[in-house]
Structures are given as C-alpha cells and as structure tokens.
Amino acid sequence: MSASSSSDSWLRRQSKRAARSLARRMRDFGQVEPAGFDLADVPSADIALYFPDGPPKLYQLTQWLPVFEGNNDVTTIVIVRQVDAFNALLGTTPLRVILVPQYEDLMALLDRANFGAVVYVNNGWTNFQALSFQRAVHIHVNHGESDKICMVSNQAKAYDKVFVAGQAAIDRHEAALAWFDQSHLVRVGRPQLDLEVNPALPLTERTTITYAPTWEGEDEANNYSSVDVYGVQIIQAMVDHPRSRIVYKPHPRVADSDDPAIRSQHRAIVAAGNEAASHDPAAGHCVLEDADMLAV
C-alpha cells in the first residue's frame, strides 16, 4: 500500500470517528425531555424570547428580562434549550420559562403557540433551528453594543429585523457587511436605560473610578481584553489616585475564562483590589463581578 493510500485510509477512519462522535453529541443534546409545558397544552404568548446556551452566557438573556417583564401590552415566554440554563432561571423571573431541548419539540411548540415574534439575544448555533419557523418575525436584539468586530457578524442577514441602539450601529453594519439590506436595522435605543436600577454602591464624596474590562472573545480577532496585559497596572494606578474609590467590574466571562492568563490576572486584580480595601477601609474599594453595569 502506498503512503498516499495509507494516509487516505487513516483520514477516512478519523472522519468516520468524528462523525460518530458528533452523532452521539447531537443525540445526547436531545435526551432531556421538555419542561415547563406540555405539547398537549401549549402556552399562548405573543413573543418567544429565545436562549440557546448554558449558564455562563445567561447574562446575555437576563439583561433583557426586565424589559419584557415590564411590558404589559404583550405576553412573553422564555424558551431555553439547555437544562442547566433552565434550572438556573427558575424562580428568577415572573415570565414563564420553558425547556425545549429537542428540535422536533421546538418546531411543534412554535407551530402550535403561534408566536408573533421570536427574539434572539445572541447568535447561538441553535438559533438557526428556530429560524426555520416561517410564521413569525425573527428579531435579533444582541446583548449590548460596541465597536468589536463581532458586533457586525454576517449572521445579521439571517434575521428579519436587527434592533440596534442608534446611528453608530447602522454605520458599523454599512461599513463592514457586503450586500446587507440596511432596512433590516431598526433603531430602538437602549431600553434598559428606561428601567429603574437600584445603585450597587452607596454615594461617596470620593471620585469613583471603575475598571470594567471585556473578555478575550471567541478568537484572537475578537480579543479586546486588557486584563492579561495591563489589568494589574491599571488597578494599581487607580489605587494611587488620591481620594478615589476603586471599582473593578469585569465582563461576566472573565472570571471563568478559558485563557489561563486571563484567569490568573483576574485573580491578581481582585487580590490587589482587596489589599487596597484592607489598607483603606473608608475608601470603599470593591470588586463587583455580578452587578448590573448600569447600577455602578
């Protein structure tokens, strides 16, 4: 047997092995039964708020929950696809939360519930399962805006409408995307700014300086984080500023980052902040990993 034939044979075996592994994963993905509803008694609602991922990304959904909770003109149901996210959400919102892991059940639910709109907070891969449903308007609202390259994903073309904060987002899409219909973009502002938010910190006469770094992204092209490069130096410079209160508010995905350098420097930043707080208790230095950024 030639080296080429041997190589081809090995590649075929590896391909089959990978295919079997993927098939098992896809099968296991649907092993959990639906929860929170019965297909024989499908809930009625105007809007389905769709969340495809697990607990580490729940911040993408929870920032939108108060917006829909406060709207008495329409009924909203939250659809989640993963059981750990479903369990984490139970008891945290007055909105009805239902678990639909399997594609067949999702299609049956969408068909019978007759939602007017399905709203997406990210570009999770199972979004495209829900997008196959024809009789609803599919709206992408994202989970914040910035000048990151991921804010102008080509996936925006998949949705009927993409809600954005303002003109900067429209300009961003126009500059980055080819053959994109700008009429799909709808300016809605930032609805969360209209909500009442309880302050996370007491008032102080000191100057409050907040360090709120982002995470490293899914790939290097989306890595805008300063945590592993300048984080400790930034905190130390803030501490050295006279009459200041230092607040460290990292992106929700910094603490459990897959990057060891990010995790290590995050811990070092927390340690530096705690040390500064112990040296000057009256300053009110603090680490706020779970607080709403609008409350800081």
Regions found by a protein language model. Give the residues of each.
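A nucleotide-sugar donor-handling region in carbohydrate enzymes
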Residues: 6-33, 155-229, 252
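Nucleotide-activated donor-dependent transferases that construct or modify glycoconjugates
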Residues: 21, 25-54
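A short, charged/proline- and glycine-enriched loop
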Residues: 39-47, 134-135, 203-208
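Active-site and donor-binding regions of nucleotide-sugar-utilizing enzymes
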Residues: 50-58, 62-193
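Conserved catalytic-core segment of nucleotide-activated headgroup transferases in glycan assembly
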Residues: 56-72, 193-268
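A donor-sugar binding/catalytic signature common to diverse glycosyltransferases
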Residues: 120, 139-140, 282-296
